[in-house]
A protein has these predicted regions:
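Intrinsic-disorder/low-complexity, polar/charged segments enriched in Ser/Thr/Lys/Arg/Asp/Glu/Gln
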Residues: 16, 43-47, 79-81
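Core SAM-dependent methyltransferase catalytic element
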Residues: 81-87
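N-terminal first-folded block
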Residues: 2-32
C-alpha cells in the first residue's frame, strides 16, 4: 500500500480513450461521446473534455440516461474533463 509518487491516488484506472470536444456544439458532442462509448468494451473508461455551459450541463446527464457512469468531473481551465465508465 505505497502511495509514494502517487499524485493521482484514485483507483479509477487510466482512460482507454480521451476525446477533446471543446468547440463542438450540442448535440454533436453527445453524439461523438456516444459513438466512442459504443466502440469500447464494458467497464472501460472514457475521458471527455467539454466546454462550460450547455455541454457540461447536457452531456453528463445524457450519458447517465444511457446507463453509463459519470465517475468524475473536474475543471481544467475554461473546460471540464469528464471521466465516464461504459456500462
Amino acid at each position: 500500500m505505497s502511495h509514494a509518487n502517487s499524485q493521482n491516488h484514485n483507483n479509477e484506472g487510466d482512460p482507454a480513450c480521451e476525446l477533446d470536444l471543446r468547440g463542438v456544439i450540442c448535440p454533436y458532442n453527445f453524439v461523438k461521446t456516444k459513438l466512442q462509448l459504443e466502440a469500447m468494451e464494458s467497464g472501460e473508461l472514457l475521458a471527455v473534455i467539454l466546454d462550460d455551459g450547455e455541454p457540461i450541463r447536457n452531456v453528463p446527464e445524457s450519458i447517465r440516461n444511457e446507463g453509463h457512469i459519470v465517475v468524475r468531473q473536474e475543471a481544467i481551465g475554461q473546460a471540464f474533463r469528464v471521466l465516464i465508465r461504459k456500462k
